Amino acid sequence: MKKLLSLLSVVREDWYSRPWWMNLTFYFCIYMTFVYLPFDFFLKPVEVDQEIWFGFTLTGWWAKATEPLHWIIYGLGAYGFWRMKTWMWPWSSVYVAQIVIAMFIWNILNDQGTLLSATISASIFSIPMVALWRSREKFDG
């Protein structure tokens, strides 16, 4: 029981070390690094594999070949948010800016996408982009 309480204490202390929205980003990076990307890389068949880069969908072996790049990015993001590394600013916001661009372009290129859906999705991802850009002082590790 003491070990569980000690673990909860560590998790609680870690949670309060950064803003709640940054914790969500941190835990998303952990999920992508340790759960989704290993599944995607090792278990997902090449025929159904897809990766999005700057709004363009890569499929098959091109997707499989670029998965390690996503893995590295999310792994570095998880480590950077965990330790609040100074190099996370501006790179975290730059990466999210790439996601903003990707969401806009992907919606335009997608047969079911529209200018409205592109604008809405890009606007949604602009929120964490701006928040990360304005968080320079938080990255002090």
Specify the residue positions occupied by each region the protein language model found:
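Topology signature of small-to-medium multi-pass alpha-helical membrane proteins
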Residues: 2-141
